[in-house]
Amino acid sequence: NILDASGELIYSQDLGLKGWGWQVNLNNKITYFDRQSKGWFVMDSLKNIVDSVYCKNEYIADLHDFLALENGNYVLFSYDEQEYATDTISPNGSQDETVIGLVIQELDSSHNVIFEWKSWDHFYMSDYPDINYNNNTIDFLHCNAIDIDEDGHFLISNRTISEITKIHRTTGEIIWRFGGAQSDFTFSNDYPFSQQHCIKGLG
């Protein structure tokens, strides 16, 4: 449903499983996630679908967040399951355990991949002592939000490790970590946050 400034209903459509994550995106177009096709759809002001966006390189887009940029680019991410020998890290680990990592992709307006970032190159489970190794699947990096900071680099929210991470948009290197076991910042006269579910750069 879309309401005007006075609360009057001006648009309504039932899309079932397709209607997830509705928002007016950074390019001023409406975007939403289709849980059946695993893609993000872009609508114009007349509610016509003008584009559909999927992860590339055999990754499957996640429904948590999506950026449609003013320059025509798109930013989306995927959870990446890998088999990992966690018994080398914890006595509760196993030789062959499923661990969920993260892949971020930026696509140009023609849907070509111009940036791809993989958490396996930058995050190490041994750095996070509070991981629960008793689960059948370890949800290591549960990213639930992504944004672009005022200097153009990525901000991501990783809920399971209670960390907000800033990532260089060209090199992929981590600029800083905020919160969690590897924080580059300290909290003064306040409690650290945990299990956060959103991140927005306020400038």
How should each PLM-predicted stretch be described?
Residues 1-203:
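Histidine-/acidic-rich catalytic cores in large beta-rich domains
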